UniProtKB/Swiss-Prot annotation:
Disulfide bonds: none
Signal peptide: none
Entry GO terms, CC: cytosol
E.C. code: 2.7.4.25
Catalytic activity: CMP + ATP = CDP + ADP; dCMP + ATP = dCDP + ADP
Protein name (record): Cytidylate kinase
Originating organism: Streptococcus pyogenes serotype M5 (strain Manfredo)
Protein family per UniProt: Belongs to the cytidylate kinase family. Type 1 subfamily.
Localisation: Cytoplasm
Signal keyword on record: no
Length: 226
């Protein structure tokens, strides 16, 4: 049976990562968290106080402490920078609020996209992000673009933060998500947009299981036809 490449794109908190992880597990595919890679680069910038004028220093740190993924005992994914476990650190609000400017840096995107394509070559992979279907994997056999209302996405982020023990204000989250949408869709390099051949799916009011079922059925149909 042929293993395909699946690209899932969409704005912040549209359910991309949650859905991608479940589908990867169900299909026996590899899940590559591209967002965690950009968050890791952002974490480096913030930890060292680097600005957008010091891209070379961020890249140098990425080379010294490469991003890697490992599995925890419970099956969840751990993110490492070198030997440092940054799984929780990269989900903090300061990283979330700064990831747009770091991910917009052409040199950072070029390096991380190169790594992502190399990993995806063999197929049997599912990636989520903001430019997977348009830039990273334009040859993906299945491209999905998830959308949802700002209200619903803020609610999801609020619940996620509670589960992780991170304090947050609901109204502030709404403002931050709306601001992130604007930044991501208006940046010069790889702006957030659906690929021309992507299936657009509004997840507002749809359960995670419903989204998973929709995407998985599409994937299985493509595999059966190939």
């Amino acid at each position: 049976m042929k293993a395909i490449k699946i690209a899932i794109d969409g704005p912040a908190s549209s359910g991309k990562s949650t859905v991608a992880k479940i589908i990867a597990k169900n299909l026996g595919y590899t899940y590559l968290d591209t967002g965690a890679m950009y968050r890791s680069a952002t974490y480096i910038a913030l930890t060292h106080g680097y600005t957008d004028k010091e891209v070379a220093l961020i890249l140098e740190e990425l080379e010294k402490n490469p991003i890697s993924f490992k599995k925890a005992k419970d099956g969840s994914q751990l993110v490492f920078l070198g030997d440092e476990d940054v799984t929780l650190a990269i989900r903090q609000n300061d990283v979330t609020n700064n990831v747009s400017w770091v991910s917009a840096l052409p040199e950072i995107r070029e390096e991380l996209v190169h790594q992502q394509r190399r990993i995806a070559q063999a197929g049997g992979i599912i990636m989520d992000g903001r430019d997977i279907g348009t830039v990273v994997l334009p040859d993906a056999e299945l491209k999905i673009f998830l959308v949802a209302s700002v209200e619903e996405r803020a609610e999801r982020r609020y619940k996620e933060n509670l589960e992780k023990g991170i304090e947050s204000d609901f109204e502030t989250l709404k403002e931050e998500i709306a601001a992130r949408d604007y930044k991501d869709s208006h940046r010069k390099v790889s702006p957030l947009k659906a690929a021309e051949d992507a299936l657009i799916f509004d997840t507002t009011g749809v359960s995670i299981d419903g989204v998973v079922q929709f995407i998985q059925e599409k994937a299985e149909k493509i595999v059966d036809m190939s």
